[in-house]
Design a protein with these regions (language model features):
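Phosphate-binding and adjacent anionic-ligand microenvironments
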Residues: 248, 285-461
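Gly/Ser/Thr-enriched, mixed-charge loops and adjacent short helices
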Residues: 13, 113-241
Length: 461
């Protein structure tokens, strides 16, 4: 992680950690950098960069700032307007853009925002290019073998254009519809759009596939994104599914790159369940290349043991769909993801895609002719407790001798019946304390003891 960009982009409270000037300068650098790359290869056409945004009030401000920077540096800015992160990746790859930018802070509250950078292949931007962006933000850029106090502006006809590209978003919707192998006619499907990016996309996809689609939290006002809604507040969808006799419910986050499910009984279906359900189906259909499912260190022990029982290999990466995708690409894997609902189907997408994930879960339900509850009940999840402690210094809090002592004590109590994972958040000032164990009471006790030690040592904010 860099000074500004974490595991999922440059994120912070709007006009505090992340300002309009930051966005303008990110645009200035990217417009110049891709133009310079072209010029050095004998191509004097303007770079083309596609931009999407979520429904936060500040997203419009950051969009204008990015466009100002891009066009001032000679790049053409193509605007998808309010759309999902995976749609930006899709359009960047399909339409040959130099890169893509998504303005979103994902599942964070409305007052936060972020800038996610996507390369021309629809993948998250490489760390070397991000390091150059950060160097320019800090005013000491070394690039192309030169030191730049400032990068040049475009002039006259070289100033970039701004292009309305809502058709790109529409092509993404059409692509999702084309992936539907089954009619959903007769199915009652509930969608929680988190008052975010999926509000005007997800229903269109399910309606086109014949579902009776019931939608909640699809009235964004700029201030209500993720507020008691979406994949991080799934209780409302659980109640809605049961009360409205739905077959299944799907909850997306603010930029719809993740999805969690609710079965017909109102039970939450996590990313681990989705990996198990889809992994088993893909093995049966011969689609699971390498016979491997890629998860992260946060995935439940129950998932790994269930996959092993099915004869499916598993791999663990660091937390972050970026790392999952990197492993999948290097090892030619087709399915990977996170417990939080970032699920990657690499045959169809280069990033986590919540709407695609919901379609794939429906595909398994239709193919197996089973309810989601029946499919999920074959996976036994170990009790898991997660406590997020907001801290002054993430690294120092983790390294504290007393905290390390508390971690070792918990590991001794658990033995081989559970595990402890303490890690820093990649996007927020948090230390995440996670404990799993067969015994739920012991799990909760160990987790609270570690979290309390962090607080007692004075690290908590």
């Amino acid at each position: 992680m860099g000074k500004y960009f974490g595991t999922d982009g440059f994120r912070g409270e709007a006009n505090k950690e992340l300002t309009a000037d930051h966005a303008y300068r990110v645009g200035r650098f990217l417009g110049w950098y891709y133009g310079e790359c072209k010029r050095r290869n004998g191509d004097h056409t303007r770079p083309r960069i596609v931009i999407g945004k979520d429904t936060r009030r500040s997203s419009y401000m950051f969009e204008y700032s990015l466009v100002g920077g891009l066009t001032a540096s000679g790049a053409d800015a193509y605007l998808l307007h309010v759309t999902t992160t995976p749609s930006v990746a899709f359009v960047a790859r399909l339409d040959g853009f130099d890169c893509g930018i998504m303005i979103s802070a994902s599942h964070n509250p409305y007052y936060d925002n972020g800038i996610k950078l996507i390369n021309g292949q629809g993948e998250k931007m490489d760390e070397d290019t991000i390091a150059l962006v950060e160097a320019y933000l800090d005013g000491h850029l070394e690039c192309f073998g030169e030191t730049w106090d400032e990068i040049p502006f475009a002039h006259q006809e070289q100033i970039g254009c701004t292009v309305d590209d809502v058709s790109g978003r529409n092509r993404y919707v059409g692509y999702l519809i084309s992936l539907g192998l089954y009619s959903f006619r007769g199915r009652r499907i509930a969608l929680d759009c988190a008052n975010g990016s999926s509000w005007n996309i997800a229903k269109a996809v399910f309606d086109a596939l014949g579902a009776t689609t019931l939608v909640i939290n699809a009235e964004p006002n700029g201030l209500n994104i993720n507020r008691d809604a979406g994949s991080t507040h799934i209780g409302g969808l659980q109640k809605f599914v049961v009360e409205n006799h739905c077959d299944v419910g799907f909850a997306f986050d603010g930029d719809a790159d993740r999805c969690l499910c609710v079965d017909e009984t109102g039970m939450e279906i996590t990313g681990d369940h989705i990996l198990f359900i889809c992994g088993r189906h893909m093995k049966q259909t011969g689609e699971l290349l390498g016979n491997t499912v890629v998860a992260t260190v946060m995935s439940n022990l129950g998932l790994f043991r269930a996959l092993d029982d099915l004869g499916i290999a598993s791999a663990k990466t660091a937390v972050g769909d970026k790392y999952v995708y990197e492993y999948m690409t290097k090892n030619n894997c087709r399915l990977g993801g996170e417990q939080s609902g970032h699920i990657i189907f690499s045959k169809y997408a280069s990033t986590g895609d919540g709407i695609l994930t919901s379609l794939k879960v429906m595909e398994v339900m239709c193919a197996a002719k089973k309810t989601l509850h029946q499919l999920a009940s074959d996976l036994t999840i170990y009790p898991q407790k997660l406590i997020n402690v907001r801290v002054k210094d993430k690294k120092a809090a983790q390294a504290d001798a007393k905290v390390q002592e508390a971690i070792r004590a918990a590991e001794e109590k658990l033995g081989d019946t559970g595990r402890v994972l303490v890690r820093e958040s990649g996007t927020e000032p948090l230390v995440r304390v996670m404990v799993e164990a067969r015994d739920a009471a012991l799990c909760a006790q160990c987790c609270e003891e570690i979290a309390q030690t962090i607080r007692a040592q004075g690290w908590a904010l």
